[in-house]
Amino acid sequence: MEDEHVADLLIAGGSADPNLAPLVAAAERAGRSVLSIVHGPEGEPAFSWDLESNRLILDGREVGARGAFLRYDVFTPPVEARGLDRNGGWYAAAMGWALSRPGMRLLNRAMTHGANQKPYMLRLARDSGLATAPTLIANVEADLRAFPAPAVAKPVAGGGYVRPLDAALADAGWREGRSPIPAIVQQRLSYPEHRIYLADGRFHLFEIHSDLLDYRPGRPTSLVYRGAELPWPGVAEALAKLTAAVGIDFCACDFKTEAGRAAPLFLELNSGPMFAAYDLAAQGRLADAIVAQLTQE
């Protein structure tokens, strides 16, 4: 067996994930060495972590890393022949090893449970000084039908697209005036939509236009990088307060426009966002910032 190889950055995830390649390219630009744990239908690495010695043997070689970027694979069907979650298993193994390494640089290592709770984050955003749209979280048919139009509905726990409220009401599966799951219902806002990434202690602003209510199922009409400065007074300070409150140091926050209001309204925070298309629009600046955050001395 070869002596331990310690890389500057471990990158782990699924072979079909388009977000990994920009990080590898950014690491190469920065002169950082990369260790990969990439799994997928075409093959798996040989992974053996002995907890007694705390040594990781990867493809027959003892390895280590100073920083790590790890993503759960959402691009490959997760269930293998015996009904086990292959993607979850690889993520748990790699993340478990990374978390056990003292001093390992990770994104959002201090993140609290609340960061991934969308209703809580809407309330906390208000408390932090960010404006949000009028919002109702409910499964009561009468209350939802009384919400002022135009309005939209979105899954309370994420994992789905934004829909017109009328369409959501039509197939909600009502039983005795209640739906099976509460929904987030909000005033319908307009484009432009803004996505703000936090990486390496700085914000990165993108402006999005689309003909769709929710641009994510297709491609936006335009996606433009607007730089590292936020043009709305007080938004950067409020967003910094929000992310600090939940231990976030890397994320994407989405905002949308209300007619007559200068600053956009906060929609949600994503603690594990995709970023490949945004990095392309920013000509590599976003991936460069992520690599810098994970490899700086």
Walk through the language-model features, giving the residues of each.
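Phosphate-binding site of ATP-dependent enzymes
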Residues: 27, 149-238, 242
